[in-house]
Amino acid sequence: MSKKLIGNKSKNFKNKLGLILCVLFFLPSQIFAIENKILLKVNNQIITTIDVNKEIKYIGLINEEFKNFEKDKKYTIAKNSIIKEIIKEIELKKFYKKIDLNDEFINKFAINYFSKFNINSLKDLEILLKKNGLESKDLRKKISIQLMWNELILKKF
């Protein structure tokens, strides 16, 4: 009798396992993926929902009050921020061959700027960025564009 009981438990377990695997297999893959749609195209540069979500994280990192805004307002601000950055980049390319600054200069600027978060080294900055789902290459690009834009404006006016 005990063999029959063990056999039934084993059969029930296999049935449950099979059911779970079928459910997981047939679930739409979209449930597990972040949706990425093209939102805009600015001078042949595409802005996607992932770009906007990264920008929301970035703005939230540098502006504590931004975190309290409603989701729609955050989305609009982030989208407009990306558009402005692309326009700046397009204009900068008219005056500069390359939009990139010296690594040492960018590193010092970033550490100084993020010192309000107790950032004293590049390692600390990397940790802060990773913690917020951001990448240093994106920050580097943002800093380069903004500082070169400021320089261009000062030269023009």
At which residue positions do the language-model features occur?
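Short, low-structural-confidence N-terminal segments
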Residues: 1-80, 127, 131, 154
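Peptidyl-prolyl cis-trans isomerase
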Residues: 70-157
